[in-house]
């Protein structure tokens, strides 16, 4: 079963390599989603190390804010994409993520500031996740086996998460966790540059 799964993913990758638009989009998604997933995984560690006086209930409130505002964010970015196109919607989301990393690095030291950051994460998280998948779905070939293509999409997400988390940890080891957050900007910038090379609306 495992071997069959790998063979299926290999065939999907072979097909994707022959499709310029999909290949470029996957590269862009890999970069910006690597940073997005790393933020979600490492947010609690950052709060515990860097936020003065933060308590468990503060983290719970932050998680609730992210979940609630994520719904709103998906609606807002869906409207943006409908009016201006998916690429612009994704570009706006990535730019907000870049701004968020800079905001956290320079200004987030207290619980109420962390709440603001969590609210921003929620809004842009819901938007970028829904737009990323819908954009990918529009690029897929006419086939009944879309599940294999989305399996490949999900695998790239998991690989990106692993690389992002390792990179975050290495940077923290040699500097500090706040610098690790700032370094995520590199992934977002790479993601938006690659996205602008994708010939889609």
Residue ranges and their predicted role:
Residues 1-26:
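Juxtamembrane intracellular "pre-TM" segments in multi-pass secondary transporters
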Residues 127-141:
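Intracellular juxtamembrane helix-capping segments at the cytosolic ends
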Residues 105-117:
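Helix-loop junctions at membrane interfaces in 12-TM secondary transporters
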Residues 41-58:
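Short amphipathic helix-loop junctions that connect adjacent transmembrane helices
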Residues 72-86, 172:
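Helix-to-loop junctions at the C-terminal end of transmembrane segments
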Residues 170-188:
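A membrane-interface helix-boundary motif in multi-pass transporters
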Residues 88-103:
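Structural signature of the two symmetry-related core transmembrane helices
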Residues 182-201:
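Multi-pass alpha-helical transporter architecture, strongest
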């Amino acid at each position: 079963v495992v071997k069959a799964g790998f063979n299926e993913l290999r065939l999907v990758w072979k097909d994707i390599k022959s499709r310029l638009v999909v290949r470029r989009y996957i590269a862009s998604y890999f970069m910006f989603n690597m940073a997005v997933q790393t933020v979600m995984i490492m947010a609690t560690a950052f709060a515990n190390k860097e936020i003065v006086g933060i308590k468990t209930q503060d983290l719970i409130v932050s998680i609730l804010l992210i979940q609630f505002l994520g719904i709103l964010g998906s609606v807002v970015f869906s409207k943006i994409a409908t009016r201006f196109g998916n690429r612009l919607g994704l570009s706006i989301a990535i730019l907000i993520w870049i701004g968020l990393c800079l905001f956290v690095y320079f200004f987030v030291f207290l619980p109420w500031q962390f709440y603001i950051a969590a609210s921003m994460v929620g809004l842009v998280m819901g938007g970028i996740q829904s737009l990323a998948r819908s954009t990918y779905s529009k690029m897929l070939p006419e086939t009944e086996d879309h599940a294999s293509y989305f399996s490949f999409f999900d695998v790239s997400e998991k690989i990106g998460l692993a690389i992002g988390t390792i990179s975050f940890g290495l940077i923290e080891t040699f500097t500090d966790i706040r610098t690790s957050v700032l370094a995520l900007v590199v992934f977002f910038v790479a993601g938006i540059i690659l996205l602008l090379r994708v010939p889609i609306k």
